[in-house]
Swiss-Prot record:
Belongs to the MscL family. PANTHER family: LARGE-CONDUCTANCE MECHANOSENSITIVE CHANNEL, MECHANOSENSITIVE CHANNEL MSCL. One of its GO terms (cellular component) is plasma membrane. The chain crosses the membrane at residues 10-30, 76-96. It is a multi-pass membrane protein. This is Large-conductance mechanosensitive channel. It comes from Mannheimia succiniciproducens (strain KCTC 0769BP / MBEL55E).
């Protein structure tokens, strides 16, 4: 089998195509959620906390010296990313929960006779 034919078969398998679509949609969804958090949620939260802009919250570990920039710990951006994560995780949880509801429940295979019942049948057959 040629290399290209093998690659084509691999790429056209359902799982690979589904995963590629999921990654593309996930990337776009991540941008939407980041915009929601950065442009809608955080400004409202900033107003509720007295006009604080979370993007600017930071601890200065070392001041800027000459051309060397300051060393900062940007905890405001971290808080914003935590909000991003929580919203994305909740949305994925809700999608998985919805998909699981749509799946048909797996029917259990009919239970066969127990070992004791089989042994009793064998015993009865041997008595004949």
């Amino acid at each position: 089998m040629s290399f290209m034919k093998e690659f084509r078969e691999f790429a056209m398998r359902g799982n690979v195509v589904d995963m590629a679509v999921g990654v593309i949609i996930g990337g776009a969804f991540g941008k939407i959620v980041s915009s929601l958090v950065g442009d809608v949620v955080m400004p409202v939260l900033g107003i509720l906390t007295g006009g604080v802009d979370f993007k600017d919250l930071k601890f200065v570990l070392a001041e800027a010296v000459g051309e060397t920039p300051a060393v900062t710990l940007n905890y405001g951006l971290f808080i914003q990313n935590v909000f991003d994560f929580i919203i994305i995780a909740f949305a994925i949880f809700m999608m998985v929960k919805g998909i699981n509801k749509l799946k048909k429940p797996v029917e259990e295979a009919p239970k066969g006779p127990t070992s004791e019942e089989l042994l009793s049948e064998i015993r009865d057959l041997l008595k004949k």
